[in-house]
Amino acid sequence: EAYVSVYEQVNPAVVNILVGSGQGSGFLFDRAGHIVTNNHVVADGGQIVVNFDDGRQLPATVVGTDPSSDLAVIQVDASQISDITPVSLANSDALKVGQIVIAIGSPFGLQSSMTTGIISALDRLFPSAVGPDGTTYQIPNIIQTDAAINPGNSGGPLLNLRGEVIGVNTAIESPVRGSSGIGY
């Protein structure tokens, strides 16, 4: 029942983001209509359409991006979503290996999908953007999880059992591009 409660609490604030021929996930961060996602979800530019679970589709604009951390903030018209409660954030300093986690997102475009797992490790490094000189930035403090993360989950929230965001699902490391690998 704890999983059902978290899903019902958080899922209305989790979105599917369409950008050109690509898609990913994100979550409503505040009442001003700001949505957190991954930079690689919106980096190709073009028109951004945000799909909410209740069927609302809203255009979005990019507010800011950080390719080095692979994070981006987009914004929709807040007056159109005033009935949706934004997510809450947890204190990431309190995370423990073995803690149960929940991922909600749109793997393969399947909006509002939930998977569960545990925190497999903390403080991993993960390569991110390539700079103009060819060097790559390592994203620090990455949470490794065994919750199934697939293409399309990028930008969605990783949650604790209180429904608080503890991380942003970013990538999967797998030789077969599926959930048989390690999620971050």
Positions of PLM-derived features:
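Serine-dependent protease modules
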Residues: E1-Y184
